[in-house]
Amino acid sequence: AENFYYVILYLMVMIGMFSFIIVAILVSTVKSKRREHSNDPYHQYIVEDWQEKYKSQILHFEEAKATIHEN
């Protein structure tokens, strides 16, 4: 009977540690996602300017493709 008590105690400690780790991972993930959608300048640059940068790169690529170099 005493052995069975230690088995239950061991299982409860292991489940508690596992639960603590899972909760810590979830909380850190939620915090990082919340911080990601803030109004910091880097995030605003990504949200607003990436399409303009992409279009300018495509136009520059098209210009470079049409260039003829003579020897």
Swiss-Prot record:
What are the alphabetically sorted keywords of the record? Cell membrane, Ion channel, Ion transport, Membrane, Potassium, Potassium channel, Potassium transport, Transmembrane, Transmembrane helix, Transport, Voltage-gated channel
Chain ranges on the Cytoplasmic side, renumbered to this chain: 28-71
GO BP, one example?
A: regulation of ventricular cardiac muscle cell membrane repolarization
Q: Does the keyword Cell membrane apply?
A: yes
Signal sequence range: none
Q: According to the lineage, what is the superkingdom?
A: Eukaryota
Membrane topology type: Single-pass type I membrane protein; Single-pass membrane protein
Expression sites (tissue/organ) = Detected in heart; expression is highest in the SA node and the right atrium, and barely detectable in the ventricle.
Gene Ontology cellular component annotations, sorted alphabetically: apical plasma membrane; plasma membrane; voltage-gated potassium channel complex
One matching Pfam family: ISK_Channel
Bilayer-crossing residues are 7-27
Gene Ontology terms for molecular function: delayed rectifier potassium channel activity; potassium channel regulator activity; transmembrane transporter binding; voltage-gated potassium channel activity involved in ventricular cardiac muscle cell action potential repolarization
Q: Which cysteine residues pair off into disulfide bonds? A: none
Where is this protein found? Cell membrane; Apical cell membrane
For the keyword Transmembrane helix, the answer is: yes
Q: What InterPro entries does the entry give? A: K_chnl_KCNE (IPR000369)
* Primary role: Ancillary protein that functions as a regulatory subunit of the voltage-gated potassium (Kv) channel complex composed of pore-forming and potassium-conducting alpha subunits and of regulatory beta subunits. KCNE2 beta subunit modulates the gating kinetics and enhances stability of the channel complex. Alters the gating of the delayed rectifier Kv channel containing KCNB1 alpha subunit. Associates with KCNH2/HERG alpha subunit Kv channel to form the rapidly activating component of the delayed rectifying potassium current (IKr) in heart.
Q: How does it assemble?
A: Interacts with KCNB1. Associates with KCNH2/ERG1. May associate with KCNQ2 and KCNQ3. Associates with HCN1 and probably HCN2. Heteromultimer with KCNC2. Interacts with KCNC2. Interacts with KCNQ1; forms a heterooligomer complex that targets to the membrane raft and leading to currents with an apparently instantaneous activation, a rapid deactivation process and a linear current-voltage relationship and decreases the amplitude of the outward current.
Q: Which family does it belong to?
A: Belongs to the potassium channel KCNE family.
Name listed for the protein in its UniProt record: Potassium voltage-gated channel subfamily E member 2
| Gene that produces this protein | KCNE2
